[in-house]
Every structure is written in C-alpha cells, then in structure tokens.
Amino acid sequence: MDSRFLLALFLVLLVLGCEVQAAQQLQQDDPGSPALLGKVQESISSYWDTAKAAAQDLYQRTYLTSVDEKLRDMYSKSSAAMTTYAIIFTDQILTLLKGE
C-alpha cells in the first residue's frame, strides 16, 4: 500500500479517536466547576479544529485519483458484502424466532 494512504488513514483514525474521547469527557459533567468545563471544552474544540485543518490539508496535498477510485471501489464492495450478510443474519433470526 502507498505510504500516503496509510498516513491519511492513520490521521483519520486518530482524529476520530480524539473525537470519541472528547465526547466521553464532555459527558462527564462536573457541576462544581463550570469555568473549568468551559476551558476544557474550548481547549478540545481548538485541538479538534487544528487536527481537522491538518487532515484536510494533508488530504488536499496528497490527493490521488487512483487512491480515490480504490477507496470508492472498496466502499462499494464492502457495503455490498455487509448488505448480503445483514440479509442472511436477518433471515437466520427470523427462522430462529418462527421455529421452522
């Protein structure tokens, strides 16, 4: 695989991981310190904006049509496979519930 593709994939996963952590941290409200919560939210928002801008810049600099076509092809094949497996799984559950 191309190293640019792996780098872009790593950055996307890193950004998504940071977003999940930020969402979990924001759910844990501490009513005793609203000023601290505001500072944390502002800091996380700032980091998120910086990471998002860096990922977009990297994507624009390393954009390759062949990689884009491969990604679209992988997405279409994987979504078709998932649809097939979802139909099979649904059929198995219905058969199990009906008791045939």
Curated annotation (Swiss-Prot):
Which Pfam families does the record cross-reference, listed alphabetically? Apo-CII
**The record's account of how the chain is modified after translation:** Proapolipoprotein C-II is synthesized as a sialic acid containing glycoprotein which is subsequently desialylated prior to its proteolytic processing. Proapolipoprotein C-II, the major form found in plasma undergoes proteolytic cleavage of its N-terminal hexapeptide to generate the mature form apolipoprotein C-II, which occurs as the minor form in plasma.
Region listing for Lipid binding, in residue ranges: 66-74
Q: Where is the signal peptide?
A: 1-22
Cellular component per GO, a single term: chylomicron
Protein localization: Secreted
Q: Which InterPro entries match?
A: Apo-CII, ApoC-II_dom_sf
Cite the GO molecular-function annotations of the record: phospholipase activator activity; phospholipase binding
Which keywords annotate this record? Chylomicron, HDL, LDL, Lipid degradation, Lipid metabolism, Lipid transport, Secreted, Signal, Transport, VLDL
Region (Lipoprotein lipase cofactor), start-end ranges:
78-100
Q: In its UniProt record, which GO terms are filed under biological process?
A: lipid catabolic process; lipid transport; positive regulation of phospholipid catabolic process
Record function comment: Component of chylomicrons, very low-density lipoproteins (VLDL), low-density lipoproteins (LDL), and high-density lipoproteins (HDL) in plasma. Plays an important role in lipoprotein metabolism as an activator of lipoprotein lipase.
Q: Tell me its family.
A: Belongs to the apolipoprotein C2 family.
User: What's the protein called, per UniProt?
Assistant: Apolipoprotein C-II
Q: Name the species this protein comes from.
A: Myodes glareolus (Bank vole)
